Amino acid sequence: MIKNSLSKQENKILNYKLIRKYMSRFKSLGLYVSIVAAMLIWAFSFIWTKAALTSFRPMMLITCRLIIASVLLLLVSLLSGRFQKIQKKDLKWFLLLALFEPYLYYIGETFGLTMVSSTLASVIISTIPVFSPLLAFLILRERIGWFNVAGIILSLSGVFMVIFEPSGNFHVQPLGIVLLFFAVFSAVCYAVVLQKISIHYYTLNIILYQSLFGLMFFIPTTLLADYPYFSTLHFTLSSIEALLMLSIFASVIAYVLFARVVRRIGVARSNVFTNLIPVFTAIFSWLLLNEQLTILKWIGIATVVGGLFVS
């Protein structure tokens, strides 16, 4: 009897351990599904931006996107019970954060996308993690390793492969490339400022406040830049759909998914998945926008992704 009762108890413990093991595996699978979904959304955001720009002017598109996203983020923050008020000492950091991103970053990215392909834009933007250590070294005096240097060289080599044709011709507007690298610079500066406040606030609240403060910069700029064109704009259903997709999916859902994963597996492991964005964007652009991707361009994309892994 005693042996039987012990055997039953051991079986219960064994079953409990097996259940926990499988639950843990399902949770891990769920995390990876979440982060890949976030990367797919951000990859598609370049396609949506291209579609929205057929009707919207760049500044108006960004402002409308931020208004919708801010309302949704506020609702998510309140409903999840994670809403936090800003401490007075952090107000200047949030203003600086919003200046770099979304304000300067979106200006560079959106105007850049009016001049270059979605694929090239995603490849350049994907170099943000590569250049972050360089600025951290210059400003914060953080140590930069040889792997970081090698990653920068590889990534820039890959970008040049995507820009140039096999014949050596250059069919890209230089200003578009400059604007996209300006967006990269803004995002890297944003990451440096983010280190100052990230430990005190939930990620969701940081995204919410940077969107709200970003509107303080965007609304007057949009009125100055786009007001003369308000009466001449003609919106299509596809451009409005693209705006909603950018606002709901790219500015809210993808960030929430990414933040959830970062909390579980950390920033370093999460950022590895951003290497997928230019690959996904290239595939979407080829399938949906009929962008011509030569062998050299695919090699360039692979080189950029390799540089990201090395760094």
Kindly give the residue locations of the regions a language model identified.
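Helix-helix packing/entry segments at the starts of transmembrane helices
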Residues: 39, 62-64, 106, 120-127, ...
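Alpha-helical transmembrane segments of compact multi-pass small-molecule transporters, enriched
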Residues: 45, 68-72, 124-138, 153-154, ...
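Specific transmembrane alpha-helical segments of multi-pass solute transporters/efflux pumps
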Residues: 41, 45-46, 74-125, 161, ...
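Hydrophobic transmembrane alpha-helices of multi-pass small-molecule transport proteins
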Residues: 73, 95, 135, 144-165, ...
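Membrane-interface helix-cap regions at the ends of transmembrane helices
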Residues: 44, 48-51, 55, 69-87, ...
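Glycine-/small-residue-enriched transmembrane alpha-helix faces in small-molecule transporters
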Residues: 2-60, 170-196, 217-218
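Transmembrane alpha-helical segments that form core, pore/gating elements
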Residues: 47, 73, 132-134, 138, ...
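Juxtamembrane helix-entry segments on the extracytoplasmic side of multipass membrane proteins
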Residues: 27-32, 55-59, 63, 86-92, ...
